[in-house]
Amino acid sequence: MSHSANFYRLETRLQSLTGKAIGDFGMIEDGDTVLVCMSGGKDSYTMLSVLTALQKRAPIQFKLIAMNLDQKQPGFPEHVLPAYLKSLGVEYVIVEADTYSIVKEKVPEGKTTCSLCSRLRRGVIYRTAKELGANKIALGHHRDDIVNTFFLNMFFGGKMKAMPPKLATDDGQHIVIRPLAYCAEKDIASYARAMAFPIIPCNLCGSQENLQRKKVSEMLQAWERENPGRIDNIFAALRNVVPSHLADTDLFPFTGLATGLAKIDEASLFGETTFTQQALTFTGNVEANRMEFVRFDKIQKVQEAPERASEPSA
């Protein structure tokens, strides 16, 4: 397969960002067995491709096992993923579980199936990981998914909550990782097209995208078109949280604040832009001191005046 210089720059960027995310969050360690969840979409194909490339030159030893869940959807091309994974020479497992029938039975026609489908898949994945001895489970969510989920939870759930790049399962037996956490969806889509991955559409939810998620995604894309780099800035904000400037009493001891104890950026308390500036201080009785606010150029003139007065006259 012949690729251009632009493709190799794209591939290098994806591998570099994935490697950085793995390092920043300690996602993969020496001796790990990682279950790589394959849905047949662009994200999971890209994740497997990048992880296998990193595995070859990593300074540690870890094992990758690709997994696909055959949910018994009508018309599902069950031969596609096994043939592709076999051509790569990677270890893989195809798990058959008829979650499709359960979802269609439980969810009324026209309603979104994503929530129930996700819970059922999660249960099968955890069980498979345990059976295979995999201590890490890799999912293909990327930067845009994380930012999108953050706004969904804020707008419709009243929580500042996103998708963590790494978390422990409720039973504490597995660690779920998202190696593509730093990667932009547009880069993943470009890479998938260039690699000509055999994409498998989802018949359960592909034609009935969650309306709320779609609206949030459209909003973010509009912001990005208006101000390129905005999604990057939002994601950066998720990694640069200042609890003292939010309103969650579980994250910051507001009730324990007292004079002489807290070191808080006072400028931002009044809605000002945070910047570093040398401050004036005074001691003594506050009642006995008068404070006058003057322009910086006037301060400069006042400081220079005594020097000019001391100069000898001609």
Curated annotation (Swiss-Prot):
Pfam family, one: ATP_bind_3
Cofactor note: Binds 1 [4Fe-4S] cluster per subunit. The cluster is chelated by three Cys residues, the fourth Fe has a free coordination site that may bind a sulfur atom transferred from the persulfide of IscS.
Biological pathway: tRNA modification
Record-level GO cellular component terms: cytoplasm
Gene Ontology molecular function: 4 iron, 4 sulfur cluster binding; ATP binding; magnesium ion binding; sulfurtransferase activity; tRNA binding
Locus of motif PP-loop motif: 39-44
Needed co-factor(s): Mg(2+); [4Fe-4S] cluster
Keyword Glycoprotein: no
Keywords attached to this entry: 4Fe-4S, ATP-binding, Cytoplasm, Iron, Iron-sulfur, Magnesium, Metal-binding, Nucleotide-binding, RNA-binding, Transferase, tRNA processing, tRNA-binding
The reaction(s) this protein catalyses: cytidine(32) in tRNA + S-sulfanyl-L-cysteinyl-[cysteine desulfurase] + AH2 + ATP = 2-thiocytidine(32) in tRNA + L-cysteinyl-[cysteine desulfurase] + A + AMP + diphosphate + H(+)
GO BP terms in the entry: tRNA thio-modification
Broad class of enzyme this protein falls into: transferase
Coarse class of the protein's main subcellular location: cytoplasm
Entry binding sites for [4Fe-4S] cluster: 114, 117, 205
Entry EC no(s): 2.8.1.-
Subcellular location field: Cytoplasm
Family, similarity comment: Belongs to the TtcA family.
Function: Catalyzes the ATP-dependent 2-thiolation of cytidine in position 32 of tRNA, to form 2-thiocytidine (s(2)C32). The sulfur atoms are provided by the cysteine/cysteine desulfurase (IscS) system.
Subunit structure: Homodimer.
Additional free-text comment from the UniProt record: The thiolation reaction likely consists of two steps: a first activation step by ATP to form an adenylated intermediate of the target base of tRNA, and a second nucleophilic substitution step of the sulfur (S) atom supplied by the hydrosulfide attached to the Fe-S cluster.
Protein name, entry field: tRNA-cytidine(32) 2-sulfurtransferase
Annotated organism of origin: Cupriavidus metallidurans (strain ATCC 43123 / DSM 2839 / NBRC 102507 / CH34) (Ralstonia metallidurans)
Protein encoded by which gene: ttcA
